[in-house]
Amino acid sequence: MMVIYYLNWNGTMKELHEWEEEQKKMWAKVEGVKVWGIYTPTIPWNRAWLMETDSIDKLFEHSGPRTENIRNTDMVILM
């Protein structure tokens, strides 16, 4: 199953890059979840993570608390 996770960042660019590196390291340890890439669709503060997972439950189980710098999010599940 493929998942597109959109987010609108509300912090500094440095904080965004640090958060993304932490997330990549965390997801690399989760069996059954693969990050295919992080894309900037419109402006630098928007991101779209393309991920593959065995189960949507794995994403929710490991995602942890949301940082205050993420303003809006959307998730699209592609089966």
Question: In which residue ranges do the predicted regions lie?
Answer:
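Short S/T/G/P-rich N-terminal loop/turn motif that feeds into the first structured element of a domain
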Residues: M1-G64, E68-M79
